Amino acid sequence: MLGSLVLRRKALAPRLLLRLLRSPTLRGHGGASGRNVTTGSLGEPQWLRVATGGRPGTSPALFSGRGAATGGRQGGRFDTKCLAAATWGRLPGPEETLPGQDSWNGVPSRAGLGMCALAAALVVHCYSKSPSNKDAALLEAARANNMQEVSRLLSEGADVNAKHRLGWTALMVAAINRNNSVVQVLLAAGADPNLGDDFSSVYKTAKEQGIHSLEDGGQDGASRHITNQWTSALEFRRWLGLPAGVLITREDDFNNRLNNRASFKGCTALHYAVLADDYRTVKELLDGGANPLQRNEMGHTPLDYAREGEVMKLLRTSEAKYQEKQRKREAEERRRFPLEQRLKEHIIGQESAIATVGAAIRRKENGWYDEEHPLVFLFLGSSGIGKTELAKQTAKYMHKDAKKGFIRLDMSEFQERHEVAKFIGSPPGYVGHEEGGQLTKKLKQCPNAVVLFDEVDKAHPDVLTIMLQLFDEGRLTDGKGKTIDCKDAIFIMTSNVASDEIAQHALQLRQEALEMSRNRIAENLGDVQISDKITISKNFKENVIRPILKAHFRRDEFLGRINEIVYFLPFCHSELIQLVNKELNFWAKRAKQRHNITLLWDREVADVLVDGYNVHYGARSIKHEVERRVVNQLAAAYEQDLLPGGCTLRITVEDSDKQLLKSPELPSPQAEKRLPKLRLEIIDKDSKTRRLDIRAPLHPEKVCNTI
C-alpha cells in the first residue's frame, strides 16, 4: 500500500526523503557543539523520528507501543514540539532536551534509515487521505496535463469545482495552460465553465488573506534561517500543502506567464483560454456551456482579450448565437411569469401602478420604444405606500440583484443650489474635481441602471435643471467635461406633492363605489373586489394634479419629459388585512427564532388592528399599530417571566368586545373606550388556554406631568 501511494505521487516522496536524509546542510547543522544533532551515525534524522511519535535514539512510537499522539509520559510535549518543527521547516537545536534527559546526543536508532523512511511515508499517507488533499491533487494534475490522474481523482470523489485557496478552479488551470484533454475530462465530469476566479492581483490577494506577497508566509526566524541554508525546506512545506507566498503560489500552481499586477477577479475559464490563445480549448468551453458574454470584475468579456484570428471569429459568432438564445429564453420566461405577477409578490395593492410600470418596461424589453430617450417615471402618493419598493423591485427584475444596477439618490441632500457639484462632480480647480459626481460616477459603471431620485420635490429647483438634458437626450456631462451616454437607463422620481389631494380623491371614489354596491344589496366578495378597483379620472389629473406639479417644479419642459406619472392610492380594507397579516407573520418568525415561542392569532385580531391605519402614513401606520398593541404586550410578558421557553401563544379579542367588530359603523368619540381589546393567551400541552395576567405599565399617553 505504501509503495503504491508513493508511486501515485510520481515518486516525489522517495526523492524528497533522500534529499532530506542526504542533505549536507542537515548533517552539518549542529551548532557549536560539533555534534550531529540532526542525524545519527546511520544517517537517521532524529527530528523526523520524533515527528512520527518516537524519542531520539529509540524505535518509533509507531512500533513501540507508545502512541504518537501522547509520545509517552516523558517525551509528549517535546514530541509535539518536534512534530511542529518538522512540518514547519524548523529543526530542533542541541539546547532543546527532553524532560528528564540532560542532552540530546544524537544516538542513532537501531531501526536505521529504512524504518525512518517508512514512518515518514505513513505521515504522508495519513495526510493524503483528507478530502481537501484530493482537491489539491486535482489542481496539480490539471496543471501537469495528467488526464489519467484527473480521471482517477474524480472517480474517488474529488470536487470538480473545488477552488484553490487563492481562488481558481482546476478548469481554469487547464485552460490557461492549454491542456485541452484535461478540459474535456473536467467538462464531462460536470465542471462549471462560468465560475469566476476569486484571485485579483498578487498584492491585493496577499492583503485580503494575510499572506506575504513574495515570501513564504507563516515562518519564524529559525525557519527562515533554515530556508536560506537549505532550499528543500520550502519544497517540503509546499509538498505538505502549507502556506507559501502569493506570487510563488500563483506562478507555480497556476501559470507564470500572467501579469502579476493585473486583476483577474471574475475571470472564467473562457477568459483564460482566450488569454492563452488556444482555439481548441475555447471551442470546448463554448460547447460545454460557457457564457461568452460574461464579464469579469473589470467589465471585460472574453472577446476583449482575443487577438486577431480564429479565436476572435469564433467568439463573435458565439456571442451572436448566445444573445439570440438568451433573448428567446428570457421571452419565454416573461410569458410564463409576467412582470406584474413578480411585482405583486412583493408589493401589496397598487395594481394600477404596477400595471403602468409593467406596460412601459414590456415595451422596452420587446423593442417597442424610442431608443434615443430613456424611460422616465414620476411616482406620486402618500408616504409608506410602496413607491420606493416598486422602484427596488423593478431594478431587481431588470438586473438580477446586481448592486450596480440600482442607483438611489436622496434628493433631500440637494436642497441648495451649489450642491449640483455633488451630482455631476466639481468643475476644474475646485475641491473634489478628481472624485467625480455621485450620479455620473455610478452611471459610468452601469449605463442601463435603474436610477431612483427619492423625494425629488425636496431638491432645489435649479438642481433639476441638469435633468432636462438627462431626460431628453439620455446623456449627462460631468465636471471633467466627459459625456456619459445613458439612453438605456430607467429614471424614477418619487414625490409627496399632491399626496393629500390624491388620497382624498381615492377615498371619495371608494365611498361612492361602496354606496353603489349597498344599493344593489349584494355585499358579496365579487362586489367587494369591484369596489376596490378604482381609477383616477383624467379630469382630476388635468385640473387638480397638473397645476400643483407646475407650481412646484416651475417648468413645463421638465414635466413634458416624463413618460408616465404613476398614482399610488390608499389601501383598501382587504389590502390592509394583508398588511396586518404580513406584519404579524414577521413578529411570529422573530419570536420563533429568538425566543422559541410559537405565535398564533385569531381572525378578528386583523380586523382590530386595521383600525390603526392612517391614510397619510400608509403601511407604516399599520406597523406602528402592531407594535403598540401586540409587541408591547409580548415584551411586557417576557420581562415579567410569563412566557416559558417553547410555549405557544395566541392573540385574541375579548369576547365582550367581539360584537363591536360586527357593527358596520365607525365608533363615535364617546364610544372610544369600548374599542375591542387584544389579549394574550397561552396554550398548554393539553390544548387548554389560560389568559396571561400582565401587569400593565403606565401608558405614555395617560401620564400627567405636574408643574
From Swiss-Prot:
The modification N6-acetyllysine is found at residue 589. It comes from the Eukaryota. Its main location: mitochondrion. ANK repeats lie at residues 133-162, 166-195, 265-295, 298-327. It is found in: Mitochondrion intermembrane space. It catalyses: ATP + H2O = ADP + phosphate + H(+). Residues 507-535 are annotated as: Regulatory. Widely expressed (at protein level). Expressed in fetal, as well as in adult tissues, with highest levels in adult brain, including thalamus, hippocampus, occipital cortex and parietal cortex. Low expression in granulocytes. Disaggregase activity is inhibited by ADP. Changing residue 431 to G: Decreased ATP hydrolysis activity. Loss of ATP-dependent protein disaggregase activity. It is an enzyme of class 3 (hydrolase). ATP binds at residues 346, 348, 383-388, 455, 496, 561, 620. The record marks 126-127 as: Cleavage. Residues 92-126 are annotated as: Autoinhibitory. Pfam families: AAA_2, Ank_2, ClpB_D2-small. SUPFAM superfamilies: Ankyrin repeat (SSF48403), P-loop containing nucleoside triphosphate hydrolases (SSF52540). It is linked to 3-methylglutaconic aciduria 7B: An autosomal recessive inborn error of metabolism with a highly variable phenotype. Primary disease symptoms are increased levels of 3-methylglutaconic acid, neurologic deterioration and neutropenia. Other common features include progressive encephalopathy, movement abnormalities, delayed psychomotor development,impaired intellectual development, cataracts, seizures, and recurrent infections. Belongs to the ClpA/ClpB family. Hexamers display robustness and can tolerate some mutant subunits without loss of activity. Functions as a regulatory ATPase and participates in secretion/protein trafficking process. Has ATP-dependent protein disaggregase activity and is required to maintain the solubility of key mitochondrial proteins. Involved in mitochondrial-mediated antiviral innate immunity, activates RIG-I-mediated signal transduction and production of IFNB1 and pro-inflammatory cytokine IL6. Plays a role in granulocyte differentiation. Homododecamer when substrate-bound; the homododecamer consists of 2 homohexamers stacked head-to-head via ANK repeat-mediated interactions. The active substrate-bound form is likely to exist in a dynamic equilibrium between homohexamers and homododecamers. Homotetradecamer in the unbound state which is remodeled upon substrate binding into the homododecamer. Interacts with PHB and PHB2. Interacts with MAVS; the interaction is enhanced by Sendai virus infection. This is Mitochondrial disaggregase.
